[in-house]
């Protein structure tokens, strides 16, 4: 099934992913991250308290969940110092910003499928896109793709289901 999604995916995005394995930030993004870090490094020691990670991320427009923060802290603060330097913070934020870009790209792709704007990808939507891309997929193969992504069994693929299958198949 995943191979069917790979076949129908636009090659440019998967090729782009292979060419740039490490996410790159613009100078402006790096500056924003530096400013958020400096805001919480009030004493100028070059470190911030890991407890402030959530607030610093919020300052950059992210809404991290408690579990997500705990995981990040355990990955960064291996010695258990309770402190994080700018390099660690930059690494975390580079990852978060690239994930945000990825999600936005996936949602743009979703909208290309969902041309009737129902908020779902139907069999008809998928068949149209496959035809536009010149993919010769049988109705059975197309239905398999829907079935693989469709978690709630309504016969269509929602935005969340589409995000999940695209990330699961590592197409983005």
UniProtKB/Swiss-Prot annotation:
Main subcellular location: cytoplasm
Molecular function in Gene Ontology: calcium ion binding; G-protein beta/gamma-subunit complex binding; heterotrimeric G-protein binding; microtubule binding
Highest taxon listed in the record's lineage: Eukaryota
UniProt crosslink position (Glycyl lysine isopeptide (Lys-Gly) (interchain with G-Cter in SUMO2)): 22
Domain spans labelled EF-hand: 28-63, 64-99, 101-136, 137-172
Keyword Membrane: no
Localization of this protein: Cytoplasm, Cytoskeleton, Microtubule organizing center, Centrosome; Cytoplasm, Cytoskeleton, Microtubule organizing center, Centrosome, Centriole; Nucleus envelope; Nucleus, Nuclear pore complex
Region (Required for self-assembly): 2-25
Binding site for Ca(2+) 1: 41, 43, 45, 47, 52
Record keywords, A-Z: Acetylation, Calcium, Cell cycle, Cell division, Cytoplasm, Cytoskeleton, DNA damage, DNA repair, Isopeptide bond, Metal-binding, Mitosis, mRNA transport, Nuclear pore complex, Nucleus, Phosphoprotein, Protein transport, Repeat, Translocation, Transport, Ubl conjugation
Gene Ontology CC: 9+2 motile cilium; apical part of cell; centriole; centrosome; ciliary basal body; cytosol; glial cell projection; nuclear pore nuclear basket
GO biological process: cell division; centriole replication; microtubule cytoskeleton organization; mitotic cell cycle; mRNA transport; nucleotide-excision repair; protein transport; regulation of cytokinesis
Gene3D superfamilies: EF-hand
Signal sequence, start to end: none
The family this protein is said to belong to: Belongs to the centrin family.
Function: Plays a fundamental role in microtubule organizing center structure and function. Required for centriole duplication and correct spindle formation. Has a role in regulating cytokinesis and genome stability via cooperation with CALM1 and CCP110.
Oligomeric form and interacting partners: Monomer. Homooligomer. Interacts with SFI1. Interacts with CCP110. Component of the XPC complex composed of XPC, RAD23B and CETN2. Component of the nuclear pore complex (NPC)-associated TREX-2 complex (transcription and export complex 2), composed of at least GANP, 2 copies of ENY2, PCID2, SEM1/DSS1, and either centrin CETN2 or centrin CETN3. The TREX-2 complex also associates with ALYREF/ALY and with the nucleoporin NUP153. Interacts with USP49. Forms a microtubule-associated complex with POC5, POC1B and FAM161A. Interacts with CCDC15.
Anything else known: Binds two moles of calcium per mole of protein.
Protein name (Swiss-Prot/TrEMBL): Centrin-2
Species in which this protein is naturally found: Homo sapiens
């Amino acid at each position: 099934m995943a191979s069917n999604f790979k076949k129908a995916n636009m090659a440019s995005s998967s090729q782009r992913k292979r060419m740039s394995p490490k996410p790159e930030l613009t100078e402006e993004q790096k500056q924003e991250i530096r400013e958020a870090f400096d805001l919480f490094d009030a004493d100028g020691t070059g470190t911030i308290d890991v407890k402030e990670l959530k607030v610093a991320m919020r300052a950059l427009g992210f809404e991290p969940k408690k579990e997500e923060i705990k995981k990040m802290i355990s990955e960064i603060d291996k010695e258990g110092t309770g402190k994080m330097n700018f390099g660690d913070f930059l690494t975390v934020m580079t990852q978060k910003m690239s994930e945000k870009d990825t999600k936005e790209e996936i949602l743009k792709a979703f909208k290309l499928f969902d041309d009737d704007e129902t908020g779902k990808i139907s069999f008809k939507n998928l068949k149209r896109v496959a035809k536009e891309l010149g993919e010769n997929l049988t109705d059975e193969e197309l239905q398999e793709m829907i079935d693989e992504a469709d978690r709630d069994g309504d016969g269509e693929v929602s935005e969340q289901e589409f995000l999940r299958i695209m990330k699961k198949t590592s197409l983005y």
